[in-house]
Design a protein with these regions (language model features):
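Conserved C-terminal alpha-helix-loop-beta "cap" of PLP-dependent enzymes
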Residues: 258-259, 263, 333-372, 380, ...
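A non-catalytic, amphipathic alpha-helix used as a structural packing/dimerization or gating element
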Residues: 72, 261-264, 295-307, 385, ...
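Conserved glycine-rich beta-strand-loop-beta hairpin in the small C-terminal domain of fold type I
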Residues: 282, 298-309, 321-334, 344
């Protein structure tokens, strides 16, 4: 049958990360590609006990639920966010099937084809996919190590009149970078002044490598709410990185009218997210010390990041450099200017290691000598092996280039 796809379907792109994961699945390949937490750190027993308690209590967990999500769980998330400096109530929140759905639903209610959206460079690949599916006109804001540049942001707002600024200001995916407090305050002030909604995506913010949380800047949502009155920041979070991704439970908070409109879009999409998963998470938060669990995984991820950093430095590749992230899951490696990491990837896979080429994280003018390396999923004993395999691939790539030139 010759199916006539919609214009929106024809704008759907495939995730480069998902395609890489397909290639590496089941093979003897060490994958530094996916944004995967460490399976050895999943709280398996606590999750199993939570589901057992839910299923042994009554049958209501198997029934349809509220579109906004299980109220006791929303209350607990609101309490955690309030302790983190984001005062919020359950009425300003909706639970979603991971924070990825939150991004999609917000774009669905906000964007018409051709609407301008501002992003960082680089930025989260799957957010670019969502924006592309709604045929947004995506523009990049210049940035430095402190975050996006306020002057360029204001200039682009005046020029483009965007509907949305999408940002991952804390442990950015893919770069691992974190905006400074001063830069955050300026960005929020500008967006409030020009009435531009910010979508602050924060799936990694609780994975911190310094135990003193006061050393980290406040979220954009926290700064925004300090003004009082109308909010210009919608904020997403998730249990995927701090508990387990298969639970598929995230949230978005924002102005109560915004949340009501998102709820209408969610009703049309899937009625509600999984009741049983939300009930199990509620039980988990009641009976499991999630704060201690986050401290444990953060310490282990810090150790793995330092190991990967040391192994990369030991190679002493000409022109290679990176900054160690202060949290999160990714290290952003820059190689010498002539190396194309997309061309390097097949050689890396042949040698038994995978990464994500940096160019997929740009909406335009991609930098081809970058790669994203995940350090959370790979067991520590395999990290040195992964770097050795990457070194072999680089040697082969250079040999191939020499052959082509000759």
């Amino acid at each position: 049958m010759d199916i006539k796809y919609s214009a929106a379907a024809n704008h759907l792109g495939s995730s480069a990360v998902r395609e890489i994961l397909k290639v590496t699945q089941g093979n003897d390949i060490i994958s530094l590609a996916g944004g995967l937490p460490g399976e050895d750190l999943f709280p398996l027993e606590a999750v199993r006990d939570a589901y057992n308690r839910v299923l042994s209590s009554d049958t209501s967990a198997l029934q349809y639920g509220l579109t906004e999500g299980f109220t006791p769980l929303r209350d607990k998330i609101a309490e955690r966010l309030t302790r983190q400096g984001i005062p919020v109530s359950a009425s300003e929140m909706i639970l979603t099937t991971g924070s990825q759905q939150a991004i999609d639903l917000l774009c669905k209610i906000l964007l018409d084809p051709g609407d301008a959206v501002l992003v960082e460079a680089p930025t989260y690949l799957a957010a670019l996919q969502v924006l592309g599916s709604y045929r947004a006109d995506i523009h990049t804001i210049n940035n430095d190590e402190q975050g996006i540049l306020p002057d360029h942001l204001e200039n682009q707002i005046q020029k483009l009149r965007p509907k949305l600024l999408y940002a991952v200001p804390t442990f950015n995916n893919p770069s691992g970078a974190t905006w400074s407090k001063e830069r955050r305050e300026k960005v929020v002030e500008i967006c409030r002044r020009y009435n531009v909604l910010i979508l602050e995506d924060n799936p990694y913010g609780e994975i911190t490598f310094e135990e003193n949380k006061d050393l980290y800047p406040p979220s954009l949502a926290s700064i925004d709410r300090s003004y009082g009155g109308d909010y210009c920041v919608a904020y997403t979070g998730s249990f995927s990185k701090i508990v387990a991704p298969a639970l598929r439970t995230g949230w978005i908070i924002g102005d109560s009218n915004l949340i009501k409109t998102i709820a209408k879009a969610k009703q049309a999409a899937d009625l509600h997210s999984s009741t049983i998963d939300q009930r199990a998470l509620d039980e988990l938060l009641l009976h499991f010390d999630i704060e201690q669990h986050i401290r444990v995984i953060s310490r282990e991820y810090y150790s793995r990041m330092k190991l990967l950093s040391a192994e990369l430095r030991s190679q002493n590749w000409e022109g290679a450099h990176f900054l160690e992230p202060r949290g999160g899951m990714f290290l952003w490696l820059t190689l010498s200017q002539e190396i194309n990491t997309k061309e390097l990837l097949p050689l890396a896979v042949e040698n038994g290691v995978a990464f994500v080429p940096g160019e997929v994280f740009y909406s335009s003018q991609p930098l081809k000598n970058k790669m994203r390396l995940n350090f959370t999923h790979t067991p520590p004993e395999l990290i040195p092996v992964a770097v050795q395999r990457l070194e072999k691939a680089l040697v082969q790539w250079r040999e191939n280039q020499s052959t082509v030139r000759s």
